[in-house]
Amino acid sequence: MAPAVLANLNEPLFLGQCGAVFMRKYTNQPLSGDINNPLFNPNPNPNSISAYGNNSSKHFDDSSAYGDYVSFDLDGYTSNQLRELKKRLNSELEEVRFLRERIESGTFVSGSVYTTQARSFAGETNDVGVKKTKTKKKKIGHGQKRSNPFATDEPSLKRHVALDLMSEKVLKSMMTTCGQILVKLMKHKWSWVFLNPVDVVGLGLHDYHRIVDKPMDLGTVKMNLEKGLYRSPIDFASDVRLTFTNAMSYNPKGQDVYLMAEKLLSQFDVWFNPTLKRFEAQEVKVMGSSSRPGPEDNQRVWNQNNVAENARKGPEQISIAKKLDSVKPLLPTLPPPPVIEITRDPSPPPSPVQPPPPPSPPPQPVNQVEASLEVRETNKGRKGKLPKPKAKDPNKREMTMDEKGKLGVNLQELPPEKLGQLIQILRKRTRDLPQDGDEIELDIEALDNETLWELDRFVTNYRKMASKIKRQGFIQNVSTPPRNMPPVTEMGSAEKRGRKGGEAGEEDVDIGEDIPVEDYPSVEIERDGTAAAASGGSSSSGSFSSSGSSSSSDSESGSSSGSDSDADSVQSPFVEAKEAP
């Protein structure tokens, strides 16, 4: 199909005839009644005698012209026929323009055929002017097409056109975003180097074109974007990246231009990559909706899949059966294995070498068993806590805030008779203690790690000893303890096993080597007023501290978590003075 063209007028004939002849390229489908139409002349040769001669005869003087153009004698048409012809030619011209725009924009759908329906004009009959056929005036719109069996149906064509418009809209929005990114990039404080093309002559860069194959700058990218030379955002991004990669290729690493190009390239990727991902997602969405088959297509595909599956099942089953037949004779028939009856003795034979059974520990007293059970239950509840460091560890861990808080509360709960020992520990570790009269201010946060753990061991030993004594019911009044204290020794043994099981996780074994205290008389200490004021306790409390220190030293001898400093700090200095002579 080609647009109608105006043939050259022959001036001698034009003077004799008042009409004009318009020529149109001849199509494969002739107009209805054109061959028999007396006004139809397929030969535009003016030298022919019958160009405007007898209407009933047809002459083909120039046979080569037939099939190339169709001529219309405008003098023989009425006004209605001329209007119909004008509408027809305008419609074809609009269709050609529409197709041209689609081809240039790249949204042309291959496989769609755009043709013009053949319309018969009024008066194109054998009898001119005798009988005029009235045709209904039909409004001709853009894109009116001839029914073609090879063309796509009208609903699918409309869907393709709508999807093309959606894709074009998405592309336009993306290119607008690219322009905004380019403006932000050009406003960067380091982009002034890349705004204009490199002045090779002015800067004396004689080897620039040898290293850089395709020079590019942001100003050129902006100009190309405004002219619409980029068909996709990928082309735009490639030119922007080319600007910075050229600078990084020519300038050595570490120079200012290299660092500026590297920074701007990373910034461009940060701005552009999320936008590109959104654009690709929208494109996939549009393409997915365009490739979505209709119900008839689904039915057709389903039928084809079923036929293919049934056709595929047959050969597979046959081949599998053949393979099984070929494998069967290859398998030898093995005789059944003989049945072996095994009679088992009711008792298995003893092994020749048996390790000697471990010696059973002697039965523990009831009090010791209760103490070990209590320690085990306590250890079960402390699985989530951090283990306390041993006294002989050179590198002890830092005490946590919770442990410091508990230590402060336990120090405030100490009885007055234990304050003397507490002061001795503090004076041994800290030289200068802030003292206000009889009161000493103690800042736990200011103490070092060793002092904190030593105070913790001192408080823990006292609390364990006091709880065991109260639980067993051997002490009625702390100020007046009894003279014979065999339960104290028994408590010390139980405490030793409890601490050993709590920290080392070993089994509690009593080997019966504890020295009974009832064979020895209790120690009584007589102190004067000055010594009593220095120690801060009474004679009864001194007796208690002496016995407590003996049990504490006894427990420290069998425990891995104890320390020699505890035993020294717990024992009263007056006992040492008395034992010295």
Swiss-Prot record:
Pfam families assigned to the protein according to its UniProt record, in alphabetical order: BET (PF17035), Bromodomain (PF00439)
GO cellular component terms attached to this protein's record: nucleus
Protein encoded by which gene: GTE2
Subcellular location: Nucleus
Sorted UniProt keywords: Bromodomain, Nucleus, Transcription, Transcription regulation
Native species: Arabidopsis thaliana (Mouse-ear cress)
PROSITE patterns: BROMODOMAIN_2 (PS50014), NET (PS51525)
Matches recorded under InterPro entries: Bromodomain, Bromodomain-like_sf, GTE_bromo, NET_dom, NET_sf
Protein's name in the database: Transcription factor GTE2
Listed Acidic residues bias regions: 504-517
Compositional bias segments (type: Low complexity): 530-564
